[in-house]
Amino acid sequence: MRNVKGKVVTRIPPEPSKYPHIGHAVSFLINYMYAQKYGGDCVLRLDDTNPEKVKKEYYDAVHEGLLWLNIAPKKIMIASNEMETFYKYAKKLIEEENAFVCFWDREKM
C-alpha cells in the first residue's frame, strides 16, 4: 500500500459474552492477515466492559478459536483493565469540549 505511513496495527475486538462464530473468524483472519502482509501487528482487545455478560468460558473460547485459526496476536489487551485510562481521556475530551455527557434516560434514547 503506497499510502500507508508508519506501522500498520490492526485489532480484533471480541466481547467475551458469547461463543465466537464464523463472522468473528472472518474478521480475525482479515485483520491478522492484513497486518502480516504489511509487516504490522495485530492486537487482541477483549472488550469485556459488560461484567453481567462476560464469562471465563467465553474468554477461553476466543483463545481456542485463535489457536485453531493459527492466529497469534502481538499483544492481548483486556479492556476492563484499562478503565482508568479510558476515563482519563474521556475527561480530557469533555474538558476540551470535544465530547459531552448525555443525561437522557433509556426511554428517550
Where are the language model's segments positioned?
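N-terminal Rossmann-like or analogous alpha/beta NTP/dinucleotide-binding catalytic cores
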Residues: M1-M109
